[in-house]
Amino acid sequence: MRDVQSERDPRNVPLDYVGIENVRLPITVRTKEGGKQPTVGTFSIGVDFPHSFRGTHMSRFMEVLYQHLEEISQTRLRVTLEDIKERLKATKAMIEVAFPFAIKKSTPVTKLETVMYVDASFKAELNSTRGYVVTSTVTVPVHSLCPCSRDISEFGAHNQRVDVTVSWQGDLWIEDVIALVESSASQPLYPLLKRPDEKYVTEKAYLNPKFVEDIAKDLFLKLDPLSPCFRIKVVSYESIHPHNAVAIKEKRAEVSESSVRSNDQEHRDCT
């Protein structure tokens, strides 16, 4: 049968990336406690593409996803990238999987068991320049109360929900990053609060006011000794404004002198 994709292309234009995206598959993710959490992963996978061929073989991306990634781990992601690089004769490959991750939470006073989902993802790259790199990301919703509003107001203070997105490299569990984020905010969020819980949360937040800047700085100091490379983005959905407040802080990984010469940069982005 004729292989149209492998036919020679006279245009001689290489492509930075070809692949597939928005592929949904059932997966399991390892938890800190040693278990496996079932969830649904949304995948993107692709490679660079040489100038000499007309097209890639898209079906091979699906084949490697089905073959390797029922369970997600750094080892499985690397094996998947090595496989697709070999099958498509590429020099670099990338895969990203986004998934909802469930965490168990007890209400602060009544101790009722609840479950809250956060958005998480793993992005893995394999190429000759950076080698194998995995970046993990999680977005954690929390609660902030404005320090200025509290100090200038005779009664109350404006407060709101905040999304904190952390991307990092290194051996950190999703659960540990979630805990660090929640401890940096005015208060965590809870799917369920009875009246004693609500009283506790609102009063504790009042005693622990945080700007978005405070959350970003406090979280940076906690993550700094734990990861060589990370990015923090704090977004506050202001309750008294039609706009959001934002704070961003990055820590970039140092690279060797040879890497600096070859890449003309002193630090490596971790996102």
Swiss-Prot record:
- Name the reaction it catalyses: GTP + H2O = 7,8-dihydroneopterin 3'-triphosphate + formate + H(+)
Gene Ontology molecular function? GTP cyclohydrolase I activity
Give the enzyme's EC designation: 3.5.4.16
Q: What class of enzyme is it?
A: hydrolase
Q: In which pathway does it act?
A: Cofactor biosynthesis; 7,8-dihydroneopterin triphosphate biosynthesis; 7,8-dihydroneopterin triphosphate from GTP: step 1/1
The record places the site described as May be catalytically important at: 146
State the InterPro entries in the record.
GTP_cyclohydrolase_FolE2 (IPR022838), GTP_cyclohydrolase_FolE2/MptA (IPR003801)
Q: Which Gene3D superfamilies match?
A: Urate Oxidase (3.10.270.10)
Q: Which GO terms describe its biological process?
A: tetrahydrofolate biosynthetic process
- What keywords is this UniProt entry annotated with? Hydrolase
Described purpose of this protein according to its UniProt entry: Converts GTP to 7,8-dihydroneopterin triphosphate.
Protein family according to the UniProt entry: Belongs to the GTP cyclohydrolase IV family.
Name this polypeptide is given: GTP cyclohydrolase FolE2
* Source species: Coprothermobacter proteolyticus (strain ATCC 35245 / DSM 5265 / OCM 4 / BT)
